Amino acid sequence: MGGSESTGRKVSFGMDEEERVRVLRGVRLSDEVVNRMKDSNLPSKDQSTSTASGTTSGPTTFPSKAGPSASHSASTSKDGAHKPTARGVGHQYAEEDLYRRYEKEQALIQEELARLAKREREAAHERLSSSVLREKNITSQERRKAEHLPADLDEWAKELEQKEAELQRLNTFYREQLNSIEKKNLEIYKLTAEQFHTAASNAELRVKQRSYDPVCMDLQSNILKCYAENKQERLNCSDLAKEYGKCVSAAQKNLLFNHG
Protein backbone atom coordinates (compact mmCIF):
# COMPACT_ATOMS: atom_id res chain seq x y z
CA MET A 1 0.00 0.00 0.00
CA GLY A 2 3.01 2.29 -0.22
CA GLY A 3 3.88 2.17 3.46
CA SER A 4 7.40 0.92 2.81
CA GLU A 5 8.19 3.85 0.52
CA SER A 6 7.11 6.44 3.08
CA THR A 7 8.81 4.87 6.08
CA GLY A 8 11.08 7.35 7.83
CA ARG A 9 9.74 10.38 5.89
CA LYS A 10 8.17 13.15 7.96
CA VAL A 11 5.98 15.54 5.94
CA SER A 12 4.29 18.61 7.37
CA PHE A 13 1.71 20.43 5.23
CA GLY A 14 -1.46 22.51 5.55
CA MET A 15 -4.60 23.40 3.59
CA ASP A 16 -5.51 26.90 2.39
CA GLU A 17 -8.96 28.42 1.75
CA GLU A 18 -9.23 26.74 -1.65
CA GLU A 19 -8.47 23.28 -0.17
CA ARG A 20 -5.02 23.25 -1.75
CA VAL A 21 -2.00 21.81 0.04
CA ARG A 22 0.73 24.29 0.96
CA VAL A 23 4.17 22.92 1.82
CA LEU A 24 5.55 23.86 5.20
CA ARG A 25 8.69 21.70 5.58
CA GLY A 26 10.16 18.23 5.08
CA VAL A 27 8.96 17.65 1.47
CA ARG A 28 11.13 15.80 -1.00
CA LEU A 29 9.73 15.68 -4.55
CA SER A 30 10.06 12.53 -6.59
CA ASP A 31 12.21 12.36 -9.73
CA GLU A 32 9.09 12.18 -11.87
CA VAL A 33 7.76 15.47 -10.52
CA VAL A 34 11.17 17.13 -10.84
CA ASN A 35 11.41 16.05 -14.49
CA ARG A 36 7.90 17.31 -15.17
CA MET A 37 8.78 20.66 -13.61
CA LYS A 38 11.93 20.85 -15.74
CA ASP A 39 9.90 20.13 -18.85
CA SER A 40 7.42 22.85 -17.93
CA ASN A 41 10.24 25.41 -17.69
CA LEU A 42 11.20 24.88 -21.34
CA PRO A 43 9.20 27.16 -23.74
CA SER A 44 7.07 25.25 -26.24
CA LYS A 45 6.76 25.92 -29.96
CA ASP A 46 3.26 27.35 -29.51
CA GLN A 47 4.57 29.84 -26.97
CA SER A 48 7.39 30.91 -29.34
CA THR A 49 4.95 31.31 -32.22
CA SER A 50 2.51 33.30 -30.11
CA THR A 51 5.39 35.50 -28.94
CA ALA A 52 6.37 36.24 -32.50
CA SER A 53 2.79 36.96 -33.53
CA GLY A 54 2.31 39.16 -30.47
CA THR A 55 5.22 41.36 -31.49
CA THR A 56 3.86 41.90 -35.02
CA SER A 57 0.11 42.09 -34.47
CA GLY A 58 0.00 44.85 -31.88
CA PRO A 59 -1.81 44.89 -28.49
CA THR A 60 -3.28 41.68 -27.09
CA THR A 61 -5.74 41.14 -24.22
CA PHE A 62 -4.45 38.78 -21.39
CA PRO A 63 -6.10 37.20 -18.35
CA SER A 64 -6.55 39.22 -15.23
CA LYS A 65 -3.93 37.09 -13.38
CA ALA A 66 -1.09 38.71 -15.35
CA GLY A 67 -0.18 40.98 -12.47
CA PRO A 68 0.07 44.74 -11.98
CA SER A 69 2.10 45.56 -15.15
CA ALA A 70 -0.44 43.83 -17.42
CA SER A 71 -3.34 45.74 -15.83
CA HIS A 72 -1.45 49.02 -16.20
CA SER A 73 -0.72 48.35 -19.90
CA ALA A 74 -4.35 47.47 -20.59
CA SER A 75 -5.61 50.61 -18.91
CA THR A 76 -3.18 52.86 -20.77
CA SER A 77 -4.10 51.21 -24.07
CA LYS A 78 -7.81 51.69 -23.36
CA ASP A 79 -7.37 55.34 -22.48
CA GLY A 80 -5.31 55.91 -25.59
CA ALA A 81 -2.60 57.69 -23.69
CA HIS A 82 0.14 55.23 -24.73
CA LYS A 83 0.17 52.61 -27.45
CA PRO A 84 1.73 49.26 -26.51
CA THR A 85 5.13 48.57 -28.01
CA ALA A 86 6.66 45.23 -29.02
CA ARG A 87 8.97 45.34 -26.01
CA GLY A 88 6.11 45.98 -23.59
CA VAL A 89 4.02 43.19 -25.09
CA GLY A 90 6.97 40.75 -24.85
CA HIS A 91 7.58 41.71 -21.21
CA GLN A 92 3.90 41.29 -20.42
CA TYR A 93 3.80 37.88 -22.08
CA ALA A 94 6.94 36.79 -20.24
CA GLU A 95 5.29 37.64 -16.94
CA GLU A 96 2.18 35.70 -17.92
CA ASP A 97 4.30 32.75 -19.05
CA LEU A 98 6.18 32.85 -15.75
CA TYR A 99 2.90 32.91 -13.87
CA ARG A 100 1.56 29.98 -15.89
CA ARG A 101 4.70 27.99 -15.16
CA TYR A 102 4.35 28.88 -11.51
CA GLU A 103 0.76 27.65 -11.60
CA LYS A 104 1.86 24.42 -13.30
CA GLU A 105 4.63 23.86 -10.77
CA GLN A 106 2.19 24.50 -7.98
CA ALA A 107 -0.19 21.94 -9.50
CA LEU A 108 2.63 19.39 -9.70
CA ILE A 109 3.61 20.08 -6.11
CA GLN A 110 -0.03 19.79 -5.05
CA GLU A 111 -0.24 16.45 -6.84
CA GLU A 112 2.97 15.19 -5.25
CA LEU A 113 1.87 16.31 -1.78
CA ALA A 114 -1.51 14.69 -2.24
CA ARG A 115 0.23 11.45 -3.22
CA LEU A 116 2.56 11.68 -0.21
CA ALA A 117 -0.36 12.39 2.10
CA LYS A 118 -2.18 9.37 0.69
CA ARG A 119 0.87 7.20 1.28
CA GLU A 120 1.19 8.49 4.83
CA ARG A 121 -2.47 7.76 5.51
CA GLU A 122 -2.15 4.28 4.06
CA ALA A 123 1.03 3.61 6.06
CA ALA A 124 -0.65 4.87 9.24
CA HIS A 125 -3.65 2.67 8.49
CA GLU A 126 -1.34 -0.30 7.97
CA ARG A 127 0.46 0.34 11.25
CA LEU A 128 -2.82 0.76 13.06
CA SER A 129 -4.20 -2.43 11.52
CA SER A 130 -1.04 -4.35 12.47
CA SER A 131 -1.19 -3.03 16.03
CA VAL A 132 -4.87 -3.87 16.35
CA LEU A 133 -4.29 -7.37 14.96
CA ARG A 134 -1.35 -7.92 17.31
CA GLU A 135 -3.37 -6.76 20.31
CA LYS A 136 -6.22 -9.05 19.27
CA ASN A 137 -3.85 -12.01 19.06
CA ILE A 138 -2.37 -11.22 22.48
CA THR A 139 -5.84 -10.84 23.98
CA SER A 140 -6.94 -14.12 22.42
CA GLN A 141 -3.89 -15.93 23.80
CA GLU A 142 -4.43 -14.50 27.27
CA ARG A 143 -8.08 -15.50 27.16
CA ARG A 144 -7.19 -19.07 26.16
CA LYS A 145 -4.64 -19.23 28.96
CA ALA A 146 -7.23 -17.97 31.42
CA GLU A 147 -9.69 -20.62 30.19
CA HIS A 148 -7.16 -23.43 30.64
CA LEU A 149 -5.91 -22.15 34.00
CA PRO A 150 -8.58 -23.82 36.24
CA ALA A 151 -8.01 -27.20 34.57
CA ASP A 152 -4.26 -26.81 34.98
CA LEU A 153 -4.68 -25.92 38.65
CA ASP A 154 -6.78 -29.02 39.27
CA GLU A 155 -4.21 -31.18 37.53
CA TRP A 156 -1.37 -29.62 39.52
CA ALA A 157 -3.29 -30.18 42.76
CA LYS A 158 -3.76 -33.87 41.89
CA GLU A 159 -0.07 -34.24 41.10
CA LEU A 160 0.87 -32.64 44.42
CA GLU A 161 -1.46 -34.98 46.29
CA GLN A 162 0.06 -37.98 44.56
CA LYS A 163 3.58 -36.80 45.38
CA GLU A 164 2.66 -36.21 49.02
CA ALA A 165 1.13 -39.70 49.25
CA GLU A 166 4.27 -41.22 47.72
CA LEU A 167 6.50 -39.33 50.16
CA GLN A 168 4.37 -40.49 53.08
CA ARG A 169 4.59 -44.09 51.89
CA LEU A 170 8.38 -43.87 51.57
CA ASN A 171 8.64 -42.28 55.01
CA THR A 172 6.66 -45.13 56.57
CA PHE A 173 8.72 -47.75 54.72
CA TYR A 174 12.06 -46.30 55.80
CA ARG A 175 10.89 -45.95 59.39
CA GLU A 176 9.92 -49.62 59.44
CA GLN A 177 13.28 -50.59 57.97
CA LEU A 178 15.11 -48.48 60.56
CA ASN A 179 13.16 -50.04 63.43
CA SER A 180 13.88 -53.52 62.08
CA ILE A 181 17.61 -52.78 61.82
CA GLU A 182 17.66 -51.40 65.36
CA LYS A 183 15.94 -54.54 66.69
CA LYS A 184 18.42 -56.79 64.90
CA ASN A 185 21.35 -54.80 66.25
CA LEU A 186 19.93 -55.04 69.77
CA GLU A 187 19.48 -58.81 69.45
CA ILE A 188 23.02 -59.23 68.13
CA TYR A 189 24.37 -57.11 70.98
CA LYS A 190 22.51 -59.15 73.58
CA LEU A 191 23.65 -62.43 72.04
CA THR A 192 27.26 -61.26 71.86
CA ALA A 193 27.19 -60.05 75.46
CA GLU A 194 25.71 -63.35 76.62
CA GLN A 195 28.31 -65.35 74.74
CA PHE A 196 31.06 -63.20 76.21
CA HIS A 197 29.85 -63.67 79.77
CA THR A 198 29.49 -67.42 79.23
CA ALA A 199 33.02 -67.71 77.84
CA ALA A 200 34.41 -65.64 80.69
CA SER A 201 32.65 -67.78 83.28
CA ASN A 202 33.92 -71.00 81.69
CA ALA A 203 37.47 -69.69 81.59
CA GLU A 204 37.28 -68.69 85.23
CA LEU A 205 36.01 -72.13 86.20
CA ARG A 206 38.77 -73.85 84.29
CA VAL A 207 41.40 -71.72 85.99
CA LYS A 208 39.95 -72.39 89.44
CA GLN A 209 39.70 -76.15 88.91
CA ARG A 210 43.36 -76.52 88.11
CA SER A 211 45.61 -77.37 91.13
CA TYR A 212 49.37 -77.40 91.00
CA ASP A 213 50.44 -79.74 93.84
CA PRO A 214 54.18 -80.27 94.28
CA VAL A 215 55.47 -83.36 92.44
CA CYS A 216 58.21 -85.76 93.42
CA MET A 217 58.52 -84.25 96.89
CA ASP A 218 60.22 -87.34 98.36
CA LEU A 219 62.93 -87.46 95.72
CA GLN A 220 63.44 -83.70 96.03
CA SER A 221 63.97 -84.06 99.81
CA ASN A 222 66.37 -86.98 99.34
CA ILE A 223 68.46 -85.11 96.79
CA LEU A 224 68.74 -82.07 99.04
CA LYS A 225 69.75 -84.31 101.95
CA CYS A 226 72.34 -86.15 99.77
CA TYR A 227 73.83 -82.89 98.60
CA ALA A 228 74.11 -81.72 102.18
CA GLU A 229 75.89 -84.93 103.29
CA ASN A 230 78.20 -85.23 100.28
CA LYS A 231 79.37 -81.73 99.71
CA GLN A 232 82.73 -82.88 98.39
CA GLU A 233 81.45 -85.86 96.44
CA ARG A 234 78.24 -84.84 94.83
CA LEU A 235 78.51 -87.46 92.13
CA ASN A 236 77.27 -89.85 94.74
CA CYS A 237 73.86 -88.19 94.36
CA SER A 238 73.70 -88.66 90.60
CA ASP A 239 71.38 -91.62 90.77
CA LEU A 240 68.86 -89.66 92.85
CA ALA A 241 69.10 -86.76 90.43
CA LYS A 242 68.29 -89.04 87.49
CA GLU A 243 65.29 -90.50 89.28
CA TYR A 244 64.09 -86.97 90.14
CA GLY A 245 64.35 -85.92 86.49
CA LYS A 246 62.35 -88.94 85.36
CA CYS A 247 59.70 -88.18 87.97
CA VAL A 248 59.35 -84.54 86.85
CA SER A 249 59.04 -85.56 83.18
CA ALA A 250 56.36 -88.08 83.99
CA ALA A 251 54.43 -85.47 86.00
CA GLN A 252 54.54 -82.98 83.07
CA LYS A 253 53.25 -85.58 80.64
CA ASN A 254 50.45 -86.47 82.98
CA LEU A 255 49.46 -82.78 83.37
CA LEU A 256 49.38 -82.18 79.62
CA PHE A 257 47.30 -85.28 79.07
CA ASN A 258 44.69 -84.31 81.64
CA HIS A 259 44.29 -80.59 80.70
CA GLY A 260 45.17 -80.68 77.03
Swiss-Prot record:
Function statement: Component of the MICOS complex, a large protein complex of the mitochondrial inner membrane that plays crucial roles in the maintenance of crista junctions, inner membrane architecture, and formation of contact sites to the outer membrane.
Species of origin: Xenopus laevis (African clawed frog)
Pfam families: MIC19_MIC25
Membrane topology recorded in Swiss-Prot or TrEMBL: Lipid-anchor
Localization (cell): Mitochondrion inner membrane
Listed GO biological process terms: cristae formation; DNA damage response
Top-level taxon of the source organism: Eukaryota
Region Disordered, residue ranges: 1-92
Chain span(s) of sequence motif Cx9C motif 2: 237-247
Low complexity: compositionally biased ranges: 48-64
Occurrences of domain CHCH (ranges): 213-255
Gene Ontology CC: one annotated term: mitochondrial inner membrane
The keyword Disulfide bond is assigned to this record: yes
Protein family: Belongs to the MICOS complex subunit Mic19 family. Metazoan Mic25 subfamily.
Protein name: MICOS complex subunit mic25-a
Biased composition range(s): Basic and acidic residues: 28-39
Oligomer status and interactors: Component of the mitochondrial contact site and cristae organizing system (MICOS) complex (also known as MINOS or MitOS complex).
Keywords: Coiled coil, Disulfide bond, Lipoprotein, Membrane, Mitochondrion, Mitochondrion inner membrane, Myristate
Residues where lipid is bound covalently (N-myristoyl glycine): 2
Transport as UniProt keyword: no
Coiled coil: 94-187
Disulfide-bond pairs as recorded: 216-247, 226-237
Motif mapping: Cx9C motif 1: 216-226
